[in-house]
Amino acid sequence: MIRIRVMNNVKLSPTEVERINQRIEKARLYNDLAEAFLEAGDETEGAGLGLVMSLMMLKNDGLSASSYKIESQGNNTSVIIDIPLNISKENLQLQKTQDILKNIDGLPTFPKSIQDIQTMISKPNSSINQIAEVIKKDVALSANILKLANSAAFIRANKVESLDRAIQLIGLKELSQLLYSLGTKQILEGKFPAFLSIWEKSNQCAFYCKLIASRINLPKDTISNLVSAALLHDIGEIILLSLEEKTMNNIGKISASKEIASAVSMEEAALGITHTKVGSLIAEKWNFPDLYSKSMEFHHRPLIVEEEFISYIYPIYLADMMIKINNEEAKFSEIPEKILQFCKFEHSGEFHSFRTKALESF
C-alpha cells in the first residue's frame, strides 16, 4: 500500500471535525456529485464541495471511502490517502464512464465524401464550379452549407440562395475547414438529442469569435480556422448532455449558482470524464487537426494551452464567457487578465459594451 499524507499545523475545532465526518459519511451515499449538491443545505464553506469532489474522484478511480481520512492530533491536521498496490481493473471507471466511451467507440467514421471534397479543394487546379457540382450530389451537405452561409457568422446584406454563391462567399480555404463541423453535424444531429441546443450556442460562439478576431486583427486564415474551431469546441458536451442529461443539467445549475467549482471539475467527479475529454477523443477518432482537438480540450483551461494555439483558444474562451455572462451564469471578474489583454479589453466597461453590441447583432 502507498500512503500519502499532507499535514497542516492548524488544529480543527470539534465543530469542524463533526462537519467533515458528516460530509464523508454523506459522500458515500451519493451516486454523483450533482446529487450531492442538490441535497446540500449548508452553504458555509461550500457545504464541503472540495471534500465531496475528492471522495467522488477517488471512487471513480476504484478507491473505497475508507481510503480517505482526515485526522486531527494536537495542533496538527493530516489528510491521508491510502492507495492499494493492486486495484482491480473493472473498478477503474464508473459504469457511466464506460457507457460514454462505448458511445464514442460506436460513432461512425468521418464521412469519406467530405474527406474527398477537402482533398479536391486542396488541389490548385480545382474550381468553385467543379467543387459545387460534387457537393450538389450530397443534398444534406448542400443544405447545411447554405444554412451556414446565411448564419450569423457569415451574415450578408442579402440572403444567399445558390450553393455556388455560398461557396464563393465563404471561400474555398474556409470551406475546407468548415467541412469538419458540417461532417460532425451530419453524424451527431440525428443521434444525440442535445445537438440542436449546443449547435446554436456554438454558432453564437463562432459569431463572437469572428468579432473578437476582427478586433485584434488576426490574419484571415487564422479567422477561418477560429470560426471552425468555435463551431466544434463543444461537441463533447453534446454527447454528455444527451447521455447524462439530468446530471449535466444539475451540474450546470450548481456551478452557476454556487460559484464554487467549475462545471468541468464537477463532470470529472460525477461522471469520471469531462466533455472536454470526450471532445478530444472524438477528434482523435476522426483524425481532426490538432487545432480542433486542442480547442475541445482546453477551452475551459485556456491558460495552460501551448502558445501556438492561443490565438484560437483565448477568443473561444472569451466568447463562451460572454455567452455565460449574458445568461447570468458567470461574472466578468472570473476572466483572467491575460486573456482580456490579449483580446484588447482594458476595462470592464469596454468589455460589456462589446458584449452587448455582439448580443444585439447575433
Language model segments and positions:
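Glycine-rich nucleotide-binding loop
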Residues: 72-80
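Glycine-rich/acidic phosphate-handling loop/turn and adjacent ATP-lid/helix
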Residues: 1-49
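C-terminal beta-strand of the catalytic ATP-binding
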Residues: 8, 81-92
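Conserved alpha-helical "signature site"
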Residues: 89-234, 238-247, 263-275, 281-293, ...
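Terminal helices and disordered tails flanking the catalytic cores of nucleotide-processing hydrolases
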Residues: 330-362
